[in-house]
Amino acid sequence: MRILQVSAELFPLLKTGGLADVAGALPLALMAAGQDARVLLPGFPAILAGVRELAPVAEFTAPWGPERFGLRAGRIAIDGAAAPITAYVIDAPVLYDRPGNPYEDATRQPYGDNHRRFALLGWAAAQLAQGLDPAWQPEVVHAHDWHAGLAPAYLHFAREAGLTRTGSVFTVHNLAYQGISAPWNFADLGLPAPAFHMNGLEYHGQVSFMKGGLYFADRLTTVSPTYAREIQTPEQGFGLDGLLRLRGGVLTGILNAVDDEVWNPATDSALVQGYHTPDGRHMAGKARCKAVLQHQLGLAERPDAPLFILVSRLTEQKGLHLVLGGLDTLLAEGGQLALLGSGEAGLEQAFRERAAAAPRAVSVTIGYNETLAHQLFGGGDVTLVPSLFEPCGLTQMYGLKYGSLPLVRRVGGLADTVVDCTLEDMASGHATGFVFDRFDAADYDRALRRAFALYQRAPDWRRVRGNAMRRPADWASAAGQYIEVYRQALESAGT
């Protein structure tokens, strides 16, 4: 099957969140399963710099008028992969050649022409489905998140016109980000007037790229079974729950997985010493990773102090006010906190102040550093993910893989991947972390105290850590589920 993945970012070339990890790992898993998978990316500077052997494929006209842009093709080499990924890149410097964040300007405001920048991404996908590259035409286009949300819309109308028979799949990675644009921007999109309707892209008088993907795609997926159920409720549906209930029959929740070539404590080059736990032993490397990390971050070098880590965007969604509110308990119990992330200015400042007040117990690094992220998981004891909502979450999966036990709220993909340390689940060998239910300080505080209590029982801690590290989370299983969804999309498209 010829499958085109359409994404705004891809690890290791460009990453602002978990979308990039999926976009980098899923094509490789599909290729390993015998599928012909390629990717389509916008020509951001980091992407152009990372794609090798770029060569012109074709030129095409923008949906908004006479402007023409180039499509180039090349290879993305991924460490440990059996073969490179074939990548199409949209060559449009006027839209994509901007420094820093790919979506926002220096003042953290979305670029005013984002509707054009990402309409072009979906438009190029639809052009490929109509033969833009004479040598390769996708049978299925898989569009990821709002940035690629117009691809299914363009394909729908191209099929109506008899220009293609390509099927479409749309994946929601985070429903909170919907690609909302002013109604007058619809004229730039090159879609027929009926598309700007409640049964289409129209959302409270505005244009929603997310809604376009949800309405027009042949099949829908999201990144965990629990999140697939949650987004059909008013509480988690962000105003789109009615549409999602209507399309619930074509919606599938497929858990993200961990790329073992990138996230593997036994082979991770970012760690001072590797470690693994096939039988609960061979863990000396983790103790050394913790000691080196404490020294590197200026924390007190205490092996007995449980080290809590937080690798996250600093936003309200991530439950960081719970972490701030519980920090006194964490420190009073003898713990340490190491944070890596960036986001809302108020949260950044609040964490900086706590680090300044207790520099030997709290480390805060604002920004993102992939190497440091690996080192935090390698040296950490507990990974904090107390989210208000979490579509899937990769952070807790990295924590599981590296034996940094996740402390999470029972929501979305967190509920699907972490088993609480209840007496029953510890006895059965299923427990892998600490789970709380209510999004409040009291419930979070109880989970914190349970983590400290287990840490004091070293044999039990080692058993739970072993459970966590052995938890299967492979892309081969996820790829098989996606392939079945692609088959369903082809059937819906009539091919």
UniProtKB/Swiss-Prot annotation:
**Transferase listed as a keyword:** yes
User: Kind of enzyme, top EC level?
Assistant: transferase
Q: Write out the GO cellular component annotations.
A: cytosol
- Keywords, in A-Z order: Glycogen biosynthesis, Glycosyltransferase, Transferase
- Where on this chain does ADP-alpha-D-glucose bind? K15
What processes in GO biological process is this protein linked to?
Answer: glycogen biosynthetic process
HAMAP family of this UniProt entry? Glycogen_synth (MF_00484)
Q: What does this protein do?
A: Synthesizes alpha-1,4-glucan chains using ADP-glucose.
Recorded protein name is Glycogen synthase
